[in-house]
Every structure is written in structure tokens, then in C-alpha cells.
Amino acid sequence: MELKNTIFLVILLSITILQSSSATPNRSESDQFIVSSCQTTQYPSLCVHTLSAYATKIRHNNDQDLAQTALIISLARAKSVTIFVAKLTKETPKFKRREYLAIKDCIEVLGNSVDRLAQSVKELARAGHAVASEDFMWKMSNVQTWVSAALTDETTCLDGFSERAMGGKVKRLIRYKVVHVAQVTSNALALVNQFAEKRSVKFP
């Protein structure tokens, strides 16, 4: 509940900054927009489930609101998983050497993922204010590169737990949580790409 409240607050503040209108989005229209937009993602059901909780903060047909919200959620969940994995090393006193090294590497690459997603959230906000096509495309290229790299970081963490010799319980716990984050990040990247494509055609 605390994490969801944190995500809600960050999204509320971020979208308030981005909005040029103070009008409250219609819940039904926003829900329809979310469902339609999520069909372009690799995990549409997860996409809808993740974003629907914040439908009232996403303006109808506003692809930037949608992409921004998806990125913020991805960032919050990546942070949560990084904290979880770090705590796991402290709460579980005995690890095989292979497990310990895999967890250590995982914490490092997840930290990189968090940094890249945080950069992406800020850059996407700046891209929304771009008045020239070249400036917009440059900023969106940065966002796409960083989110893609964040997804690679998350996948790299999973690779460390792919060996059969890896302990079952630790492997299941970490894989379950990191797979979820990777899927959320994948969806966010798809929505970022969608925003970049739609917005770019509007420039002269």
C-alpha cells in the first residue's frame, strides 16, 4: 500500500507539471484509451492492469501522459525490487558462492536500471515541451535508449539466475519479481515508442 501511494503521488506531481489544462480526465474515456494503447505492448493485460489504477490522471488520447505514467511506475517498481534483493542478502545469512555473486551482480545492474529510468522520466518531460522536431527527436532518442538499456539491465539480472545449479527458493523469489519489472519496463518502452511516433508526425 505504501508503494502504491508513493507511485500515485509521483504520478500526480509529474502529470500536473505536464498538463496544460486543469480539466480532470473522464474515467471511462481514459480507461478506453489505456486499453486501446496497451494493445501495442508485449504484455497488454499487465499494461492495462498497471495503468488503470491511475486512469483519472491520464488525459484521454494523451500519449505523453500515458508514457510518462508507465515510466514512473516502472521506476518505482524497479526501486522496490532493488531494495528487496538487497534486503534478501542481509536476511538470508547463508548463500552458496554462486548465489551470492549472482545476487551482487543483480543489485548492481538493477541499480543501473533505476538510474536510467529516472533519467528517462525527466527527459520525457522535457521532450513534451520541445518546439522543434530536431529537439523532440533528440530527447526521445535519449529516452528510448535509456529505457531499452534499463530493460537490458533487468534481463542481465535474470541471466545470472538461469543456471540449474542455482538455489531454488532464491531463484524463484528474485526471478518472479524481476520478470514482473522487466515486463512493466517493456510495456513502458512500447508506449514511449508510440508517443514518439505519433508526436513526430505533428511537427512541420
From Swiss-Prot:
Residues modified by glycosylation: N26
S-S bridge residues: C38-C47, C106-C157
Keyword 4Fe-4S: no
Record GO cellular component, one term: apoplast
Pfam families linked: PMEI
Tissues of expression: Highly expressed in roots and etiolated hypocotyls. Expressed in seedlings, leaves, stems, siliques, floral buds and mature seeds.
Keywords: Apoplast, Disulfide bond, Glycoprotein, Secreted, Signal
Location of the protein in the cell: Secreted, Extracellular space, Apoplast
Entry keyword annotation includes Signal: yes
GO MF entry, a single one: pectinesterase inhibitor activity
Top-rank taxon: Eukaryota
CDD domains listed in its UniProt record: PMEI-like_3
Signal peptide: 1-23
Family: Belongs to the PMEI family.
PANTHER family on file: PECTINESTERASE INHIBITOR 9, PECTINESTERASE INHIBITOR-LIKE
Biological function: Pectin methylesterase (PME) inhibitor that probably targets root-expressed PME and PME3 in a moderate pH-dependent manner, mainly in slightly acidic conditions (pH 6.3 and 5.0) and to some extent at pH 7.5; this processus relies on changes in the protonation of amino acids involved in intermolecular and intramolecular interactions. Regulates de-methylesterification of pectins in roots and affects root growth.
UniProt subunit comment: Binds reversibly to PME3 to inhibit its activity; the stability of the PME3-PMEI9 complex and the inhibition of the pectin methylesterase (PME) activity is pH-dependent, based on protonation status of amino-acids at the complex interface.
Identification of the protein by name: Pectinesterase inhibitor 9
Species this protein is from: Arabidopsis thaliana
